[in-house]
A protein has these predicted regions:
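Charge-rich, well-structured scaffold segments of protease-associated domains
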Residues: 59-62, 67-215, 220, 249-250, ...
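His/Glu-rich zincin catalytic helix
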Residues: 1-68, 164, 174-277, 315
Length: 378
């Protein structure tokens, strides 16, 4: 979708992006605070930011409980979500264009005027515990926090996170919210039709009743080469594997794009060098690789599942093809095919306001710099 993007600095200290998409029938918003797990006051209440996020759409200045708020918010089909990471707590909405201002007001109330209470806290602590218990049946979610710990990241694994839930009290919720949900610590991205409403949106955001606060820095981990991690599960019928190659720097968008092309060559389709060949040999049903880049480090991750009898041959194939890539043994035809595939997927990935907002968020919320969409194909 054709669009233009503008960075906005508000008088209250917040900043973000307004993305004008002429003719859009939907508006998408994303409001993010550096308030994730790494900003919990201490490790004994590590899961606190996650519980704060769960309480985001509960009781507030206008609605007595989550059910009343939900009924009002969704009555015309609007969608909302919230999520927590090591660094961020993020609140997202998507709505029909005709009710953008109503939804923005509801988002303001939920973010700026929550009414935390014991009843909802008790319920959401139980819900978070249930969520984490469910994740413990997902071997990938068991594996990756242990890998993070092995390379020196200051995180807890799922079992450790569950143990901290019982320690969280209402005073902790209120303290974390007051400290982290401030104007200077907020980034926003709003994508949709801006004509005739740009000033109204800016004025509305500047009137959000948030304290100025401070902008938190993203913690930097002292990364190291990690020892191999083994998690034994009696109920596991195969091997779930994962390994990560880490570099201690942020990758700019052009390098991320290049690495995604390499991921496609190695694991993108059944025509790829690792996954495709493994499928052809009957070694693996599914595996892949991906790239993630934060403020101070970047991760090239591989994972999948393999039957025990096929593991040695699969890992040998992975090693062989990765060494070829390291030595520059990539055919021109494979490189051109990866670029062609990437260009098509790039254009397909900008068909909705939410997709466009997510594209800009990937770089902006980490570095607070703007990677123009139209520059990427070059």
């Amino acid at each position: 979708m054709k669009h233009s993007v503008e960075e906005i600095h508000l008088k209250n200290g917040a900043k973000g992006l307004l993305i004008d998409i002429p003719g859009a029938s939907v508006m998408a918003t994303r409001v993010e605070f550096r308030a994730g797990m790494l900003y919990a006051k201490n490790k004994d209440i590590y899961e606190l930011p996650h519980v704060v996020e769960h309480l985001a759409f509960g009781a507030n200045a206008k609605y007595r409980n989550e059910q009343e708020f939900e009924a009002e918010f969704t009555k015309n089909g609007a969608y909302h979500n919230a999520w927590t990471s090591d660094v961020s707590v993020c609140y997202e909405t998507e709505c029909a264009d005709f009710e953008w201002d109503r939804i923005m007001e509801l988002q303001r109330v939920s973010i700026c005027e929550p009414k935390f209470n014991e009843d909802e806290l008790k319920a959401e602590k139980a819900n978070v515990k249930s969520e984490l218990t469910g994740y413990m049946n997902d071997y990938y979610r068991l594996l990756w926090p242990r890998v993070q710990q092995a390379v020196g990241e200051d995180v807890l694994d799922l079992a450790q996170r569950k143990e901290t839930i019982a320690n969280i009290e209402l005073k902790d919720i209120r303290e974390h919210y007051r400290r982290t949900h401030t104007a200077r610590n907020m980034l926003f991205i709003i994508a949709g039709k801006m004509k005739g409403r740009r000033r109204k949106i800016i004025r509305a955001l500047e009137e959000w009743p948030l304290k100025e606060g401070e902008k938190f820095e993203i913690p930097i981990s002292d990364l190291k080469t990690g020892e191999a991690v083994s998690i034994r599960r009696k109920d596991a019928s195969n091997i779930t594997f994962g390994f990560s190659l880490v570099t201690p720097r942020h990758l700019p968008p052009n390098e991320v794009f290049a690495m995604n092309c390499l991921n496609h060559i190695l694991n993108g389709t059944t025509n790829s060098k690792i996954f495709g060949m493994a499928r052809k040999r009957g070694l693996v049903y599914g595996m892949g690789s991906s790239l993630a880049s934060n403020a101070s480090s970047s991760y090239w991750d591989f994972d999948g599942e393999v039957n025990v009898e096929n593991a040695e041959e699969l890992f040998a194939l992975i090693q062989t093809e990765m060494m070829k890539a390291l030595n520059g043994e990539i055919a021109d035809a494979d490189f051109e095919a990866a670029k062609s595939y990437a260009l098509g997927r790039f254009q397909m990935g900008a068909q909705t306001p939410s997709q466009i907002a997510d594209y800009y968020a990937e770089n902006y919320v980490v570095t607070e710099t703007l990677a123009k969409y139209d520059n990427m194909p070059n």
